UniProtKB/Swiss-Prot annotation:
Protein family according to the UniProt entry: Belongs to the IFT81 family.
Protein name per Swiss-Prot or TrEMBL: Intraflagellar transport protein 81
Keyword Ligase: no
Protein source organism: Chlamydomonas reinhardtii
InterPro entries: IFT81 (IPR029600), IFT81_CH (IPR041146), IFT81_N_sf (IPR043016)
Amino acid sequence: MGDVSYIVDSLGLPPFSYQMSLLSFTEKGPQELLQLLSDVFSTISPKHQKVDVAKEVPDQTADRLIGFLKIIKYRPNVQDPLLFRQLVAAGDRETLYQILRWVVPQAQLLEKRAFVGYYLSFPDMPEEFNFDPDIMELKEEIKAMQQEFIELHKSSDAIKTLSKDTQALKNKIKSLEEEKERLGEKVERAKGAVDKLPDRSSYMEVCTNLRKQQDEEVNLSTAIQTQRALQEKAEASYHRAAARLRELQTSYQEGSAGKLLETLNEDVKNLRAQVNERYPKEVEKRQKRQAALSEALASGISTEMDLQRLQHQATALHNQITEIQERKVAQDKARQGDKAYLQLRQAQQMATVSARKKEELGAKQERLQEKKTALTAQLDKLNAEGGGSGAVFSEEEWRTKYESMKSKLPIYKKMKKELGDLEAEVFVLAHTEELLASQEGGLLEKVKRLEKQQGISGFTETAQHLEKVSEAKSQMDEEKGMTLIEISRTVEEINNAINQRKQQLAPQIKKLRSVRQDFAEFEAKYLEKKTAYDNVVATFEARTSALEGEVSGLKAEVSENETKYHMLHCQLHITDQNIKKVTSGPAAERLRDKYEAKVKEAEDSTKALRDRQREIKDTHSTGLSQIDIMNDMLRLLQLKLNLARGIAVDMSQYGGGGGAAGGANGGMAGQTYDTGSANVLQL
């Protein structure tokens, strides 16, 4: 569950910025998880285009995702590639969670790895083509170009790294040149001062000897420190060995094999605890430290810009950690009602407390062991100084000490008796005080009863209160009088001090006035210069920002053009290889024969079509005249048919040019018809 929460939190950060909750993420199905994984890959690498997984075959989706994972060098937990492919194609939740858990946190690193891996990977092809001579030659050329790409990419990164801190390097070079000039001036002045000395050679010889002696002194002090460290180490080992020897001698003198065995078992237990618990932790810490230092040294950080970039990254990571902690606290608050979660948190807290107590006890044990070793070493040292006999005090010293204690014994007894008398007196006084207090309480009760009988209850308390108030008032008045006297004395002292101080400060005040006038003039000049400086800085910053924007745009354009150049170069090379493949070899002969046959067949077809075209051109005019004759015949026959039926016909629809002319009575006789161009009898 922790990995899922971490994945959701990481997906909410740039460059992904997926706004989803833990519940919505866990409710996603296999297809939705595959779509999310594909979108994450497309965000990391623009070469991995966004694809709708629903419209894609599962095997094709699995091959595409696994191919990208190979490029970014992902190592699955499943050793069998076929099983891993099946799990990805099926959208197995655990497998996809592991991939997301590995990919999402290191998007920036994988982006660079995907860019480089895209150009360093070979295209997929069937196995039977791998041993083709042309394919093998092409692979060798691709390998050579990949090596060239690696070198160019490294040089490009180095140039980009150097170009980041150009201004910082310029400033550093300028400061070094100024420092060089100052040092040169100092050297020249020193040479001039030395040349003026009458016995310059003797001074030079003395200075040289002094420098040699100083270097020798430094070397000797270093050697002394080294020898002292070795001596302390040897003394510590000697004390440990002496303590061990003393323990063994004690065990041997006691004659108890069980005691000796118990001691050895305890030592073995302590050593085993150190080997199994303490030393692995220290080794792990040192390995992590060494790895961090190695990475820092390998990164080649040598400029202030790099340090600032790392500081910004550290700040961003701290902010992310803070956000994650706040989100975790919010989630913990939201889960307060979950009984199982509360039990789990309680168990985790108990385990944490137990581990902390265990570490504290281990540290305490180590401190006690070190203290024991130090005390043992001190005891051994005292024994060694005492001649190795094991006795700290001699017999004469014991006798002197005994006589001193014997002479002080009467004083001790006398003071002890006085202390007993004082304690008895204190006891009697305390008992008397208790009796008087009880009697006072009884008397106060009697007084209260009498006051109540007389109808003046509370009189005693009021009188006591008034007495206390009067005492407090008198005390306050006395304090007020003393305070007023003290205040008047203090005011007089302050006035005297002020007058005295005024006399002392009079010349300084006059000087201060002139200084204030000078300050006002300098402040006006400063404001004027500051305004001019601000204007210059604003202009410079505007120009700098414009140049930076232009530089970033040009860098982006250069990067895009480099990518296009590499892509077009690869395509051109592939096209050249295809042309070479087509124009040489047995395959080219077969293709040439095939296309020559097709060309010959096309020529024969063209010749036949041309003959057909010529034939059609020859018969075209004859066909048109026959069509006109047939049209005229049809009109003539239609006209004869109409005349036979006795129908007057407008000849214009048959191509005639005029109408019919008749007598006044009309009729068929004496009528004339315009028959157009047809050969028609006149009736």
